[in-house]
């Protein structure tokens, strides 16, 4: 029997089971029936999880008197927590290459068929985190055609599947049974080429009708597949609905159950945003504050954090004018690991409030208290959002020289607009216990000639968003 199950990404039992399995492995207790793997396409998340679990279990093994170095712990952790590319590459190594007639087939000369496993991997269960981020057919086909990002991996021309379809196909190679658990969140697509959860149902309908689908009624809401999932499910042969597969209470902002609804209303200009916020404030559940001064935001974060509670600054990847606020956006998985895991004595820690991370690095992770810096990439204009990206190009000046011209250009691509707004949805829901939103005041100074000192940070590019958030009832610090 083959099952495809949908669940909310904040299900704690998944993480706890993973931790328990890793602990038993690292401390020498072998479980031969262990048949699950946690998969994610989120490199920073996998890097942080692997490092955190390796550190934790190395300490626990040491406390039991067992010798275990961190590299061994990391290797054993990676048996259960994998970047999706690694799992995918293992299966790609087994297929006939090049693909002919748009049919992916196992090459018997490259793989050995086993009684239970068939040509599949050893795991019965694949837990795919943030399944809505699986790649479209075009993105994965382009990626495999050029042999990975840098052209140094296996090249597979004319690849005919989306990432979701290929993962189902991979588990379908087993001779006995398999389950794919898709952890999904609504309105979370933030990257070009993310297919959304509808792609999984399309794959089932097209080629895997013998699979059974289990999901929650809430998955047909507007924020999932833009409300079109129900239409796709009408063509699915075996569908079972269960409300047990939906987490109705947010565990990230655990002090305020209605906080995620407030953020959704804020971003969609829903008139009930003010009343939801008023109820949160009345219950004194979750502080949501507003400021135009980054130093006030830093001071508030330091005052709120107790003990080992973690603070940090968040910013979108489309933001471009944060340097005047003394903010550095870090890059690379290693730096992200240090940002999340080091304590307050380490300058690389998020708690120093000098380095920031973007929605790409923080997706799937969270802080106790956070500051979201709202730049001029997404702006409120009355009752709608406008989208902008900073453009730097050279232009001919009166002095007969080429000079750089820097300005915000409108982003007109509808798909990119969706990603840019969803980036703020991700950032605004990363704090467990409280959030401050910093909207810069901009730079109103003029040069001696009467021109703006910084035309990219004029007050008017920030003021509309500030006035909108303040009108909802956000208190200013």
Task: Report each predicted region and the residues it spans.
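Conserved RecA-like ASCE ATPase "motif II neighborhood" in helicase/translocase motors
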Residues: 56, 68-171, 354-358
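Conserved helicase/translocase motor-coupling segment
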Residues: 190-196, 205, 216-383, 414
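Conserved Walker A/P-loop ATP-binding site and its immediately adjacent core
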Residues: 34-52
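Flexible loop/turn segments at secondary-structure boundaries
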Residues: 2-8, 44-48, 56, 133-136, ...
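Short secondary-structure boundary/capping segments
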Residues: 52-60, 140-147, 193-204, 227-233, ...
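C-terminal accessory regions
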Residues: 176-179, 352-476
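Post-Walker A helix-loop "phosphate-sensing" segment adjacent to the P-loop in P-loop NTPases
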Residues: 3-23, 28-32
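Signature of the SF2 helicase/ATPase Hel1-core->accessory helical subdomain module
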Residues: 127-231, 382
């Amino acid at each position: 029997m083959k099952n495809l199950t949908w669940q909310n990404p904040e299900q704690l039992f998944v993480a706890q089971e993973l931790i328990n399995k890793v602990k038993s492995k690292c401390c020498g207790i072998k479980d031969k029936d262990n048949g699950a793997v946690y998969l994610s396409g989120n490199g920073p998340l996998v890097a942080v999880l692997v490092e955190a679990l390796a550190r934790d279990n190395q300490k626990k093994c040491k406390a039991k008197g067992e010798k275990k170095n961190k590299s061994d712990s990391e290797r054993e952790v990676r048996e259960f927590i994998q970047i999706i590319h690694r799992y995918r590459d293992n299966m790609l190594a087994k297929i006939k290459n090049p693909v002919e007639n748009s049919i992916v087939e196992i090459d018997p000369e490259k793989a050995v068929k086993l009684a239970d496993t068939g040509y599949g991997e050893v795991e019965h269960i694949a837990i795919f985190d943030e399944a809505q981020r699986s790649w479209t057919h075009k993105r994965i086909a382009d990626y495999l055609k050029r042999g990975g990002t840098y052209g140094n991996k296996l090249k597979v021309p004319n690849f005919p599947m989306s990432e979701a379809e290929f993962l189902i196909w991979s588990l379908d190679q087993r001779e006995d049974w398999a389950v794919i658990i898709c952890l999904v969140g609504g309105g979370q697509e933030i990257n070009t080429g993310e297919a959304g959860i509808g792609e999984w149902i399309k794959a089932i309908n097209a080629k895997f009708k013998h699979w059974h689908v289990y999901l929650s009624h809430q998955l047909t809401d507007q924020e999932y597949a833009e409300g079109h999932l129900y239409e796709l499910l009408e063509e699915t042969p075996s569908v079972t609905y269960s409300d047990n597969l939906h987490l109705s209470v947010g565990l990230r902002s655990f002090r305020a159950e209605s906080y995620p609804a407030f953020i959704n209303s804020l971003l969609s200009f829903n008139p009930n945003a003010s009343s939801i916020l008023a109820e949160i404030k009345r219950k004194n559940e979750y502080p949501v504050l507003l400021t135009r001064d980054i130093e006030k935001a830093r001071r508030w974060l330091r005052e709120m954090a107790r003990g080992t509670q973690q603070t940090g600054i968040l910013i979108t990847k489309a933001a471009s004018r944060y340097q005047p606020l003394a903010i550095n956006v870090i890059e690379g998985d290693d730096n992200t690991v240090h940002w999340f895991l080091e304590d307050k004595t380490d300058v690389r820690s998020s708690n120093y409030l000098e380095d920031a991370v973007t929605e790409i690095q923080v997706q799937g992770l969270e802080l106790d208290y956070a500051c979201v810096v709202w730049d001029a990439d997404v702006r409120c204009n009355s009752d709608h959002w406008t989208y902008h990206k900073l453009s730097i190009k050279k232009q001919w000046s009166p002095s007969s020289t080429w000079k750089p011209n820097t300005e915000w250009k409108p982003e007109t691509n509808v798909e990119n607009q969706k990603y840019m707004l969803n980036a703020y949805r991700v950032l605004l829901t990363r704090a467990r216990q409280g959030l401050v939103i910093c909207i810069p005041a901009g730079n109103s100074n003029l040069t001696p000639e009467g021109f703006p000192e910084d035309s990219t940070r004029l007050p008017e590019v920030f003021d509309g968003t500030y006035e909108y958030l303040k009108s909802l009832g956000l208190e200013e610090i």
